[in-house]
Every structure is written in structure tokens, then in C-alpha cells.
Amino acid sequence: MSKSICSTGLRWLWVVVAVLIIDLGSKFLILQNFALGETVPLFPSLNLHYARNYGAAFSFLADSGGWQRWFFSGIAIGICVVLTVLMYRSKATQKLNNIAYALIIGGALGNLFDRLWHGFVVDMIDFYVGDWHFATFNLADSAICIGAALIVLEGFLPKPTVKEQA
């Protein structure tokens, strides 16, 4: 018996589309309006700064000769497949987990697009305090982190009790 997509977690795939539109749109604006390395202050402690990331988070393996592009692309595809299957197997009413999965999928697909299209990931958010700068990141990275945090949070929330019928 097949399930209606609306009754599964796939009902939340619109979140993936929203993340992709926002992420790829922001990267397009950076690519069209910034030179590599250019910085524009937004607020105290926050800049827009165009950087290219050839590795993973925190530029992990960025100088590894190019194989990491395909390695991280494969990981992103695998994660997207696994999370999509988990969404299909869960009920649409499991909002927190499904939204978390959708945020991670959207972020992974945004960065995957960059890796495959440009050969690098476009980063632009530069958070700093004084002279200390956090690693430059993008909106896809933010979606992935928020999704992961929601999964952890869900683990700490009390499970709904099922009322027994007499």
C-alpha cells in the first residue's frame, strides 16, 4: 500500500526549496557584486566577505589537490538520500525532525551545487569579535547547523505519550 506524500515527512520538502532559493540567491548576488576577498561591513561584528572554500567546514582539506571536491560531493549526495528516505518513512506530523532534515538537505544541496558548478563553495558571512574572526560561512552552512541543532534538541524533548484506549 502506497502512502500519500502529504502524509509523510516529504510534505516538508518545500523547506528544501526555500533554503536552496535563499542560499543560491545570496551566492549569486555575491558572485555578481563582489571581487574575491572583498569585504563590506554590515554591522559591528558582521561583514560580507567573498571567499572561496575548496574544502569542507573550516576549509578542512582545502589544499588537498582536488579529490576532496568529489569526496565531499559524494558525502552530500549520500546524506541527502538518507535524509529523504527518513522523511518518507516519518509522519508529516513529526514536524521538528522533518524540518531539521529538510534544512540539512537544502544546505547540502546548496553547497553541492557550488562544488559541482564552480569547483568551490561560495562563502560570505564573516562574524568577528575584535581581531578574532570566525570561519567565513554561507547560508547553506547555517541551514545545516540549525538542522543539526534541531535534531539534537528533539532528542532532549519529552516524547508524546500515546493514550491507551479502553
UniProtKB/Swiss-Prot annotation:
* Listed name of the protein: Lipoprotein signal peptidase
Cellular component GO terms held in the UniProt record = plasma membrane
UniProt subcellular location: Cell inner membrane
The species this protein was found in: Klebsiella pneumoniae subsp. pneumoniae (strain ATCC 700721 / MGH 78578)
- Which top-rank group of organisms is this from? Bacteria
The chemistry this enzyme catalyses reads: Release of signal peptides from bacterial membrane prolipoproteins. Hydrolyzes -Xaa-Yaa-Zaa-|-(S,diacylglyceryl)Cys-, in which Xaa is hydrophobic (preferably Leu), and Yaa (Ala or Ser) and Zaa (Gly or Ala) have small, neutral side chains
Q: Which GO terms describe its molecular function?
A: aspartic-type endopeptidase activity
Look up keyword Plastid and say if it applies.
no
Pfam families, per database record: Peptidase_A8
Q: What is its main location?
A: membrane
Q: Which residues cross the membrane?
A: 12-32, 70-90, 102-122, 137-157
The biological processes this protein is annotated with in GO are: proteolysis
- Briefly, what is this protein's role? This protein specifically catalyzes the removal of signal peptides from prolipoproteins.
Q: Does the keyword rRNA processing apply?
A: no
- Do you know which NCBIfam families this protein is assigned to? lspA
- EC number(s) in its UniProt entry? 3.4.23.36
In the bilayer, the protein is annotated as:
Multi-pass membrane protein
Its annotated pathway?
Answer: Protein modification; lipoprotein biosynthesis (signal peptide cleavage)
The coding gene here is lspA
Do you know which PROSITE patterns this protein is assigned to? SPASE_II (PS00855)
Keywords noted in UniProt: Aspartyl protease, Cell inner membrane, Cell membrane, Hydrolase, Membrane, Protease, Transmembrane, Transmembrane helix
Annotated active site residues, numbered on this chain, are D123, D141
Sequence similarity: Belongs to the peptidase A8 family.
